[in-house]
Regions:
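Membrane-anchoring hydrophobic helices of lipid-metabolizing enzymes
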Residues: 1-28, 160-260, 265-276, 300-307, ...
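A cross-family acyltransferase "interaction/gating" segment
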Residues: 2-3, 11-12, 19-20, 30-141, ...
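Short conserved beta-strand segments at catalytic cores or DNA/RNA-binding microdomains
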Residues: 25, 41-44, 277-278
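Short, flexible loop segments at the rims of nucleotide/cofactor-binding pockets, characterized by
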Residues: 235-241, 288, 315-320
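Non-catalytic terminal/interface segments that mediate subunit docking, oligomerization
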Residues: 261-265, 282, 288-291
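Short acidic-hydrophobic, aromatic-tinged amphipathic segments that line or gate anion-handling sites
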Residues: 311-312
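Single conserved hydrophobic/aromatic residue that forms the stacking wall/gate
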Residues: 438-448
């Protein structure tokens, strides 16, 4: 296909660096070289502005308008092309390269220049499945309508391809929060409570925004890179590694399914154990449900950057918080993310499993019940240790018969307790549970 004269390249960005990289790749592979005088390419965005805070112009390119008006337009083959700078986060060999790799965040000219400087030898050009012009010209519509249709088809194609490479886009936390606050359920709850009062409505909107900030994660790949280095040292120096059993089944399940990981909970390190192993096995990092008691100074930011989002122990009669939290779960499922939560609710102090708490399970089931695009699988996981980090604090609690309150000082005192060798650690995946088999009548009946 690409050797014919009917090829039109569609580039997702307006970057001249990307265009020149495509020209070089085309020349190397004896493909048609994109040239302005041949009118065989177009870019969906205008040129990047100089500074990061300036947004690029979204536009329908002049070349696309000319293509639509061409009498032979139906014979043309539009090939979407993506250019990614830098290797995936788990394969980067330097933190500077990681910072300037491609992500969902926008790029300025300066950032693009730095990407070329630090990742110039790691540029990857992807020629995607062609967009057949016959898909566009089957209906007799105006040229402006056909331009918009082509633009939408290409942007959807680029977004799917980018998600396959980078994972779902929740890097822009403000966008996620904005979508939660503008959801129909949150708006309806605010409207019902306000009863027409603009002053009350404004106050409720502020409350909802505060709740969303409190809940949402803020994944940072530079921080995850540091996690990887620190946890790799930890598991191999304080434990005799972290042995994983059954990971091979996860790779197949991750395709076309939303996965809900449900590990046992014996130690604070559980929050990062599963993510560490998924990361090292090139699987998507989950969003982790963490108790609000862990949203402490320093620690809360570290956990949030690793994918944790925070949940209050009890919602009580706070309907607005409940709506915001529920919508957050829905948005995560809609964007294709997996979830990790601890069914026991808290850490076991005795080593025995605690009875599961049905509240979060019920909310998770309810949040994906009306979504038909993906199947949902629960994955039970056992995380066991020969010795746990919190061994000494558990002994103190058993003697006093009082549970110690979480604080940043208690966390660091726990860390200071594990100077010695802690033995072996194991992470084992159980058999997946298909939610569709249990959620037909209603979530509550299924849980019972």
């Amino acid at each position: 296909i690409i050797e014919t004269n009917n090829v039109i390249y569609a580039i997702s960005t307006g970057s001249n660096f990307d265009l020149n990289t495509l020209k070089k790749a085309a020349k190397t592979n004896n493909f048609p070289i994109p040239k302005k005088n041949k009118k065989n390419f177009f870019q969906l965005k205008g040129a990047r502005r100089l500074f990061p805070w300036q947004t690029p112009r979204r536009r329908n390119p002049r070349e696309l308008h000319e293509l639509i008006k061409d009498p032979d337009a139906a014979k043309k083959i539009i090939i979407p092309v993506d250019i990614f700078w830098g290797k995936s986060p788990d394969r980067q060999d330097h933190w500077v390269k990681l910072i300037f790799r491609d992500s969902w965040e926008g790029s300025s000219f300066l950032r693009n220049l730095l990407k070329v400087i630090f990742n110039g030898r790691q540029a990857n050009v992807f020629f995607h499945k062609p967009l057949e012009s016959e898909e566009i010209f089957t209906q007799k519509k105006s040229s402006s309508h056909l331009v918009l249709k082509t633009d939408r088809l290409l942007r959807a194609r680029f977004r799917r391809n980018r998600q396959a490479k980078l994972g779902p886009d929740i890097s822009n936390r403000r966008t996620l929060i904005h979508s939660i606050l503008n959801s129909s359920s949150v708006k309806k709850e605010i409207s019902n409570f306000s009863k027409g009062s603009k002053k009350v409505e404004a106050a409720q909107n502020k409350r909802a925004y505060k709740y969303a900030l409190e809940i949402c994660s803020d994944i940072s790949y530079p921080v995850i890179y540091l996690y990887d280095k620190a946890l790799n040292w930890f598991w191999n120096n304080r434990y005799d590694g972290l042995e994983i059993i059954g990971i091979e089944k996860i790779s197949d399940l991750a395709v076309g399914n939303s996965l809900i990981y449900t590990p046992s909970h014996r130690s604070h390190i559980d929050y990062l154990a599963l993510s560490f192993k998924l990361y090292t096995n090139n699987l998507m990092l989950p969003q982790i449900v963490a108790g609000k008691n862990l949203n402490l100074p320093v620690l809360g930011r570290i956990l949030r950057n690793g994918g944790a989002f925070f949940m209050r122990r009890s919602f009580g009669a706070n309907k607005l918080y409940s709506k915001v939290f529920f919508e957050h779960l829905r948005k995560l499922f809609q964007r294709g993310y997996s979830i990790e939560f601890f069914p026991e609710g808290g850490r076991t102090r005795t080593g025995r499993l605690l009875s599961p708490r049905p509240g979060i399970i019920s909310m998770i089931i309810k949040s994906f019940q009306d979504m038909d695009e993906r199947d949902v699988k629960f994955l039970p996981i056992s995380i066991t240790y020969e010795k746990v980090l919190e061994g000494k604090s558990y002994l103190r609690e058993s003697k006093r018969r009082i549970k110690e309150k979480e604080s940043i000082f208690s966390i660091f005192s726990t860390i200071s307790d594990f100077r010695g060798y802690l033995g072996n650690a194991y992470l084992q995946f159980g058999e997946p549970i298909d939610c569709l088999l249990y959620t037909s009548p209603s979530p509550r009946d299924a849980l019972t």
